[in-house]
């Protein structure tokens, strides 16, 4: 009994946490759960922290299968698949995550700004010069590998690259295959955007699952090797790796939040004039330039880092729960499951992982981080997938590079998608 009282879930005592869970169950059964910011935040944060806690307690899950992060994703996905969570709540979570509410934008704004501004300037510039070329070369290698394997197994080069490789590298659902399906539909004589979207979605979903498994495996297998940078892409001095201790200040956290949101809006403004480039990509470029030129005052940098710490600590598990509940559709995945499809998806993930690993050694980067950041991330489903992949491999500090690779490669996929759909069909 004493041990139960001392048990804490994310710093919250077990009796108090049980009260939160009981309230959510009762209000959901009564059909009175508010499908707004209050109700959905309570649901996702409580569910996310609970599933993470359970996952961390399972020995095999904790040691070999990604622990709490992967368990949160799997657990939430199964709750949705078996209709344990009502469908109207799932729909509301979907809107909350990426629709009208933009909860993911809130989270990713904090993540990108905090990770870039909190990084050592020299380290950021040094790593970026080598990482971006590796991500692009890896993408080209992955594209042709999937096409060639497709030819060998009777799936054809065109169908393999256009319906497996391209969607896997497109950057997810919203910013990836939604515009890609529109581009395909416009390029085909009798193209139907909805039908094409349903053909592209399984590759994105399954590719994301394989990317999570791949990132987790790389991190585990090479944990104690010389190839592991422990979250850092390039070899660095102690001074470059040193993270200053920051004392949280309520007013500064508010300032950091406003600055992060303003930079996201600046990305929106640029996206208005260049709609083919995602707002996140513009945001990364802006923050990168500000950091590289030492434009942001130290106290403002610290404010953004504080905001990042608060959001990361309290909302990461909630985001993973939301991804599992609303964004991973096992029915869609099952409908496309053929052995050829599995082989092609595996080819993309394995080849891109190996290519980025060897390119990292050639360019002088840590292979573990590069294989995760350029290989696995380029097969994930965009912002949500990046979070899932990096969380599973305990590399969340790499979010800026992940978004950079994802958005850059995603934009290239959209451009070439419009050209190749007319060329092949």
UniProtKB/Swiss-Prot annotation:
Highest taxon in the source lineage: Bacteria
MF terms (GO), sorted A to Z: antiporter activity; organic anion transmembrane transporter activity; symporter activity
Pfam families named in the record: 2HCT
UniProt-annotated location(s): Cell membrane
Keywords: Antiport, Cell membrane, Membrane, Symport, Transmembrane, Transmembrane helix, Transport
Transmembrane segments: 11-31, 35-55, 65-85, 96-116, 134-154, 196-216, 246-266, 269-289, 310-330, 339-359, 401-421
Main location: membrane
Record's catalysed reaction(s): (S)-lactate(in) + (S)-malate(out) = (S)-lactate(out) + (S)-malate(in); (R)-lactate(in) + (S)-malate(out) = (R)-lactate(out) + (S)-malate(in); glycolate(in) + (S)-malate(out) = glycolate(out) + (S)-malate(in)
GO cellular component, one term: plasma membrane
Membrane topology type: Multi-pass membrane protein
Protein task: Secondary transporter involved in malolactic fermentation. Catalyzes the uptake of divalent malate into the cell coupled to the exit of monovalent lactate, a product of malate degradation (precursor/product exchange). The malate/lactate exchange is electrogenic and results in the generation of a membrane potential. Is highly selective for the S-enantiomer of malate. In the absence of lactate, MleP can also catalyze the proton-dependent transport of malate.
Family: Belongs to the 2-hydroxycarboxylate transporter (2-HCT) (TC 2.A.24) family.
Description of its domains: The 46 C-terminal residues contain structural elements that interact with the R groups of the substrates. Interchanging the 46 C-terminal amino acid residues of CitP and MleP alters neither the specificity nor the affinity for the di- and tricarboxylates malate and citrate. In contrast, changes in substrate specificity are observed with monocarboxylates.
Protein name per UniProt: Malate transporter MleP
Top-level taxonomy: Bacteria, Bacillati, Bacillota, Bacilli, Lactobacillales
